[in-house]
Each structure stands twice: as C-alpha cells, then as structure tokens.
Amino acid sequence: MMLFFSSLYDWLPGVNVFRYITFRTVAAMLTSGLIVFLFGPSIISSLKVRQGKGQPIRADGPQTHFKKAGTPTMGGLMILSGVVISALLWGNLFNIYLWVSLFVMLFFGAIGFYDDYLKVTKQTDKGFSGKARLSLEFLVASIASFIILQVGSPGLALPFVKEYFINLGWFFIPFSACVVVGLGNAVNLTDGLDGLAIVPVMVASLSFALIAYLSGNINFADYLQIHYVSGVGELAVLLGAVFGAGLGFLWFNAPPAAIFMGDTGSLALGGLLGIVSVATKHEIVLIFIGGLFVLETLSVIIQVGWFKLTKKRVFLMAPIHHHFEKKGWTESQIVVRFWIIAIVLALIGLSTLKLR
C-alpha cells in the first residue's frame, strides 16, 4: 500500500524511498514486530480466559511439561495478524507471489486453528482427523502451486550446479505441494518446547528474504548464476514481516512461555516457507535452510518405521527434542543448541548461492 505513495515523490519529498524493497522489508519487520509486541498482552489475556485449561499436555510426554498446564495456545493468531497487516501495508498489492503466499499462510493457519480449537475444547491431544487435515493441506498447496506454474517455469534448480534445471512439467504441482505440506508439518513437529520453533522460522525467513531479493533482481541473479524470477523479490517484504512478528512473539514465547504458537502458527509459517521456496526455485536449498525441521521430521519417520519393523525404538521419544529431554538435558539447553544448529544449517544453505 505504501508503495503507492512513491509515485507522488514530486509533491511529497522523501516518499521515493518506498520504491525500494530493502526499505520496505525493514519497515515491515518493525511494523509487524510492534503490532505483536503491543497487542500481544491483550490477545494472551483473551485467549487465556476463553480457553480455560489451555493446551492439553500429553500424558506420555516428559514430566517437566506438566508445569506448563494452563498455558494458552493459538499464539499463531498474534503472528499472522502482525504479518498480514504489515505485508498489506508495505507490500506491492499487485504482486501475484505476495497474494499466493498469503493464501497458503492463511489457509494453513485456518486448518491449524481448527485443530487447536478441537484440542482445547475437547481437552485432548487428538485434534483434526489426520487424513482430512492432510487432504485440505494438499488441496491448498496444489492450488498455490498451479498458480505459480502459470506465471513461472516448471523447472527445478539444483544447488552447486550452474544454469541447470530439471523440467518437471506438470509434475511440478504435486512436487511443490509435497514441499509445502511437508514443511508445514515439519515446523509443526518442531514446535514442542518454549521458543524452539519460532527462532528457526525467523532464521529461515531472513535467509529466504535474501534469496527472494537476489532471485528477483536480474543483475544479482545473473552474477550468482541462480534462476531469475521476475517479481519474486517482493516476498522479501513478506518474510521481513514474518521475522519482525517472530521477534515480537518470542518476547512472550521465551521460557517460561506465556503462550504457545499452536498449530495455528506452526502450520501457517511452515506452509509459507514452503511456498516461498517453490516460488524462488530453491526447494532443494530449503533442505539446508530448514534443516532443523527436516531433522525433527526424520526422527519421527525413523522412530515409527523402526518400531513397526522391530518393535524397538531408536530414540527415547520422538521428535528428537523430546529424546534429549529424556536424556536429562534442560529445556533451555535443547532450545539454544537447536537454535545454533538452525543457524549453522541456514548459513550452509546460503553458501550454495555462491558455490557453483
């Protein structure tokens, strides 16, 4: 919206700065962060009153989690509110990538909200039917992937390789849908400790903001020999808003958390990162930048698969952050060490931009 005022620079000195993606990205960060920080306390109070007992605690989980009883969930509403308002204020409202990404984020958030609602009202850790939930997620992701295919190419870029793309054809749609749904649920699995998921999400958002900016600039894309995608640079503004909202949310989600993100936030943010990786043609790089989420998901797959084969467990509990809880690590140790892993993996992912 503010981009409109840049056309009035002859009458309003200084508004020309609104043309620059870098300026609007920083402005989006500050705006979303301020929104979440200022309105967070009232939202938390409202959710606490409405939810009563708060998010139910798993009976088979670590004993230390029972002290979290009564903590409200659906904190993703705070994040999504800040992101949407900030993105609409500072983003280019004529950019298709912005709208497709918001579409995925909000619909995944709605699915997560319904899941949280069922868990809170029924006081059970079993929410929305798994099959129904996945079906809706794949439907939303497929629609978004189809739209991106209409405005872009069906190519899959490979890191470390110069100017080589695999033409996926119509297979681009199911492949992209799997990326979006996979990451949405991967972030959801990671969100099991206070502050554990939000910082890696912020790290990934900042990393993909840089990738989107470079991929959307023909000069930088040519220099780095990465796939140029016209208009995708606008996603840097949206991802900047995610980073800012994440900072605001971390203020309340830091141990001991005053509120949990819930499926409302984790599904929405994971789905958003997934569709951004598709739009920027960096789906494979997502494996590195979102590496912590991948590791958490793999731990669940390994645990379930091995148990079905041998009736034995590889980990004391999955996802893997619970394994370390059972090993005696404190929650703060796990969270901070996993943050470090997320940052290192993101740096490795960003290094692929130059290593070709």
Curated annotation (Swiss-Prot):
Its EC number is 2.7.8.13. It catalyses: UDP-N-acetyl-alpha-D-muramoyl-L-alanyl-gamma-D-glutamyl-meso-2,6-diaminopimeloyl-D-alanyl-D-alanine + di-trans,octa-cis-undecaprenyl phosphate = di-trans,octa-cis-undecaprenyl diphospho-N-acetyl-alpha-D-muramoyl-L-alanyl-D-glutamyl-meso-2,6-diaminopimeloyl-D-alanyl-D-alanine + UMP. It comes from Bartonella bacilliformis (strain ATCC 35685 / KC583 / Herrer 020/F12,63). The keyword Cell cycle applies. InterPro entries: Glycosyl_transferase_4 (IPR000715), PNAcMuramoyl-5peptid_Trfase (IPR003524), PNAcMuramoyl-5peptid_Trfase_CS (IPR018480). Catalyzes the initial step of the lipid cycle reactions in the biosynthesis of the cell wall peptidoglycan: transfers peptidoglycan precursor phospho-MurNAc-pentapeptide from UDP-MurNAc-pentapeptide onto the lipid carrier undecaprenyl phosphate, yielding undecaprenyl-pyrophosphoryl-MurNAc-pentapeptide, known as lipid I. Pfam families: Glycos_transf_4 (PF00953), MraY_sig1 (PF10555). It is found in: Cell inner membrane. One of its GO terms (cellular component) is plasma membrane. Belongs to the glycosyltransferase 4 family. MraY subfamily. One of its GO terms (molecular function) is phospho-N-acetylmuramoyl-pentapeptide-transferase activity. This is Phospho-N-acetylmuramoyl-pentapeptide-transferase. Keywords: Cell cycle, Cell division, Cell inner membrane, Cell membrane, Cell shape, Cell wall biogenesis/degradation, Magnesium, Membrane, Metal-binding, Peptidoglycan synthesis, Transferase, Transmembrane, Transmembrane helix.
